[in-house]
């Protein structure tokens, strides 16, 4: 993979059963990556090192805790030797504001965390009238597409 995107998910390694998945969703499990030899055996050498990651998560999500987004960002960034930059707040028009943190290594963003202010458990920027969709959020589909396209340009 040249890029990974995650919207309202849990960090790798936080669950290994239905019960631990529920605890992970509520932010009550610690995130961890498998030991490198286990990870390579499981997914092959193509996943070493980890690709850049985009994380989108609503700070009002009462199903999957936003703590998972931050835990994933830190875990992924640490594995790539990336450090957090300053948090920037962005807002376009009447859409929900977004707190953006970029974790950089070697001058490049390796992890981009976008915490969407006021977004519950819904697809950000989704179609109106659909379940689990919030049209007032930034357009997650466009953000993911643009992020992945930028990563393809680097290979």
Regions found by a protein language model. Give the residues of each.
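Core-facing hydrophobic residues within beta-strands of well-ordered domains
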Residues: 1-2
């Amino acid at each position: 993979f040249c890029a990974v995107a995650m919207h309202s998910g849990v960090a790798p390694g936080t669950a290994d059963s239905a019960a631990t998945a529920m605890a992970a969703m509520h932010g009550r499990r610690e995130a961890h990556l498998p030991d490198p030899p286990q990870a390579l055996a499981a997914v092959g050498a193509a996943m070493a090192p980890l690709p850049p990651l985009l994380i989108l998560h609503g700070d009002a999500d009462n199903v999957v805790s936003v703590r998972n987004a931050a835990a994933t960002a830190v875990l992924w960034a640490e594995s790539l030797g990336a450090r957090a930059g300053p948090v920037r707040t962005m807002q376009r028009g009447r859409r929900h504001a977004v707190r953006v943190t970029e974790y950089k290594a070697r001058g490049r963003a390796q992890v981009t965390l976008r915490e969407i202010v006021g977004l519950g458990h819904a697809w950000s920027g989704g179609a109106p009238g659909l379940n689990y969709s919030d049209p007032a959020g930034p357009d997650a589909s466009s953000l993911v597409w643009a992020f992945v396209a930028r990563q393809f340009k680097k290979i």
